[in-house]
């Protein structure tokens, strides 16, 4: 086959995509096969057959929170305005001065598709005292890696502010909460978090940034098992075949690959109150040494587009049809290029998020995903060619016009526009049982405290 610059680029882009959906498992042994089977069963159990019910419940809670905000503001006046919780998740816990004494109350607060997530509730408190990550096979007690591999439910907190540079990706086990409230904890300059074939995980109040691809090697993934891992991608949080996951009040930026990926039939996920920034650089991958025609010898790097969020990694992974994800009260801020998220196959409810900057587009997809966009604010960039919120890939209009992409109550600013598709009478938008979201004009308030919080124990947060 004679390579041209064009088909060479496409070839290596395909290679990149294939590599990105591998599990990074060097030896797919009986332990991993069993975990994968259990994960598929958990995903089927977590899938909600009527996602409209979940969307309605969240929208109803937002409405109640806003209708009660006036009385709450009067109450807060007595506290000199030191606490203002502007959405229902935050109102559930933030203004309680005793939140640190009852950390597990946080599990009562989750909304959306991840609403049944309880993390380490009912388990012991594990205090991380050591920010080192030197031994990947026998992690040191008191480190984050030692905490997340324990077999029992754990509520993981931190003794002090710390920066944790993970030597390789952090492979978690089920029934864990990583709760950094009250501390400034950064996962930075090393590996990211890997949730692979697990369930019931809460990640709260972390800073995750400057995550790098790992080299792989022998890594312990449970108390009783370790094995060889291949090179990791450099995602901040990778959700791979996992269910009942809640990511809340996390600040993320500048990871080598994606900020958050959810793939391989991951479902029952809520991402809320997060702040995403500075993820628009382009990575280049060096082409292996091959004999090319003369005209392609100078082409030694290929472009790898970065994604803020990738939900579904392959057009061939039809198992991602089970994917259901809620994005609520997040701020997609400065320095983001595209893919907020980029969706294949599954269902995404994006509600009351603030999209204040993008360079190419905000929401994209392929393989007929279902997208319900409600009450978001979209502020388009100055570039006249990047005003469209949406982008469909690898399908002509004759095909994508049947995909269900709906916008309701979104606020479009600076020329932004959302191209809808699908039946205009789709059940999402019709019927007496439909509860509308609060419109996009409420977003600046609902997302006001997105990102990691500066909480102090003994005081409202």
Region spans (language model):
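Acidic glycine-/aspartate-rich tracts in secreted/extracellular proteins
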Residues: 132-133, 161-162, 183-184
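Cleavable N-terminal signal peptides of Sec/SRP-targeted secreted and luminal proteins
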Residues: 5-23
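Acidic Gly/Asp/Thr-rich repetitive segments characteristic of extracellular carbohydrate-active
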Residues: 107-156
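Right-handed parallel beta-helix
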Residues: 175, 180-183, 199-210, 225-226, ...
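Extracellular beta-rich repeat passengers
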Residues: 27-97, 298, 342-461
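Extracellular beta-strand-rich solenoid/capping regions of secreted or surface-exposed proteins
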Residues: 140-152, 163-177, 187-204, 210-242
